[in-house]
A protein has these predicted regions:
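Short, solvent-exposed loop/turn segments at the edges of secondary structure
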Residues: 78, 113, 201-205, 257
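Acidic/His- and Gly-rich active-site-bordering loop/insert found
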Residues: 2-125, 154
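Acidic-enriched catalytic cores of C-N bond-cleaving enzymes acting on peptides and small amides
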Residues: 199, 217-267
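Short Gly/Pro-enriched turn/cap motifs at secondary-structure boundaries
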Residues: 70-76, 196-200, 253-256
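Short glycine/serine- and small hydrophobic-enriched flexible loop segments
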Residues: 23, 142-149, 232-238
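Acidic/histidine-rich catalytic neighborhood of metal-dependent amide-processing enzymes
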Residues: 125, 131-205
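The feature captures the short pre-catalytic strand/loop hairpin that immediately precedes
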Residues: 119, 207-213
């Protein structure tokens, strides 16, 4: 009966869920600017009666962990938000995790709707982060609201993590781990096809530096072009990816060629 009650509430409050997601989309949160959306999430959880922990990850502490990835931007003003719905006791705990940062919106010429408008057209919501992954973060929040509205008291604690800096490093989640947040089970609420995704490819960032030899335009053939060398590196990385895909696979994803990707994400040259 409890499950049916929750599902019934969610169906009858669909518009409320849509409007909540629109509120989230309309607060830009490109990686590096997570502060405003996190203040909104902390306020929302506080109003719902959860115990809320709003904290800025410590780079000094993160650097001590082997899973730490060097940040591209400072962390000041970029907090994590963790909410806890305390259980009655005697039950297992559950943790929901979702990131709140989004990738840059890019050129507005590529958008049919303003990326921060959350416009709805033809049954779809348009905006940066609707899929990746403010919809998942909104679902986490609305699940708790549904439980509360139905008067359900869980036995175990329900913890919800809204983390920063997922798009670049994943250090937001690492900071929650290092602060001691854990549960008997956890679900990352990234959007999916409603199928359990039990594995992740992980991430390694690396930098390749090549050194050329400067020369004026009149004598450029006497120099060494760093750009030409860079092209060779790009080709080598492409061949390396093909080699990896031919030799490495994951038992959970045997038919996905891109399960072991390797690619150049940024190319800089010149002085």
């Amino acid at each position: 009966m409890k499950k049916e009650a929750v599902m019934s509430w969610l169906r009858s409050h669909e518009q409320e869920q849509i409007e909540f997601l629109q509120q989230m989309i309309r607060i830009p949160s490109v990686t590096g600017n997570e502060g405003p959306i996190q203040e909104f999430m902390a306020k929302t959880l506080t109003e719902m009666g959860l115990a809320v922990d709003l904290f800025v990850p410590s780079l000094e502490e993160l650097q001590k962990h082997p899973a730490y990835v060097a940040p591209a931007q400072p962390y000041e003003g970029r907090p994590d938000v963790v909410g806890t719905l305390k259980g009655a006791g005697g039950g297992r705990s559950l943790l929901f995790n979702g990131h709140i940062d989004v990738i840059p919106e890019g050129s507005l010429d590529n958008w049919q709707h303003d990326p921060w408008s959350a416009d709805i057209a033809d049954g779809k919501m348009y905006g940066r982060g609707t899929s990746d992954m403010k919809s998942g973060a909104a679902a986490m929040t609305m699940a708790i609201r549904a439980i509360q509205a139905c008067g359900i008291r869980l036995k175990g604690d329900l913890i919800v993590e809204y983390v920063m800096d997922e798009e670049l490093t994943g250090n937001g989640t690492l900071a929650c781990v290092m602060k001691g947040y854990k549960a008997d089970a956890g679900i990352c609420c990234e959007t999916s096809s409603m199928c359990v995704q039990p594995g992740s490819i992980g991430r390694i960032w690396f930098t390749i530096n090549v050194k050329g030899k400067a020369a004026g335009i009149q004598k450029h053939r006497e120099g060494v072009s760093g750009i030409d060398l860079g092209y060779l590196v790009c080709k080598a990385v492409e061949e390396y990816e093909a080699l990896r895909m031919s030799k490495i696979s994951h038992p959970l994803y045997p038919d996905i060629l891109s399960s072991i990707p390797c690619a150049i994400g940024q190319f800089d040259s010149g002085t």
